[in-house]
Amino acid sequence: MQGKSFPGQCKKAQSYCLWLEKWNYTKRQELVNLSGEPPTSPGSALLVLGCPQVPVQTSIALYLINRLKKSGFVPVVAGNKAANTLLVIADPDRHYLGEVMDLDRAVAMITDKKRDFDRCFVFIHNDAGISYAATMGAISRAKVFTLVYGEHYDELVKQIDFPCTIIAAKAVHNPLPLKKALDEVTPWAA
């Protein structure tokens, strides 16, 4: 920590930066348990978001991120630009939101075996969502959960013919039916 220079910054900012660096080091040290190994967590979770045409997607995504984080998962959001932007604007201080990436980039990284996840939650309100869920089931080792919603959710559920856990409800503007269906499955439980 010594020897750092803070050109053009006041003393208060310097001391805050040094305090923050020391605090981060302390927190990293706390992550090591008695055996010297980092603590185990349930793992990582990918949330796949498509076009945010149906209003419930953003609120359910934030709710799911919160539940996953409380259970020890590290959630990552992969969506199109509109879906990602809605989440970033809804949570500007990143209280819930962590890593956010482009959906096509996430698919490429998983396909190239550069990254994978333990759980994958695909938000579905149209045929494209079903295609993404099938793709994730084929390229990833993750356990796939499909969140099917919208006016015609029942027709979409009938099209799912690949292994996954289906969470479905008629939810367009009111997220509570989908939240209830999600809570019944508790996909964040280890």
Question: Can you describe what each PLM-predicted range is?
Answer:
Residues 58-70:
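Histidine-anchored nucleotide/phosphate-binding helix
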Residues 74-80, 146-150:
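Short internal beta-strands
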Residues 6-45, 57:
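Short N-terminal or domain-adjacent regulatory/targeting segments
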Residues 115-135:
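Mid-chain, well-packed structural core segment of small domains
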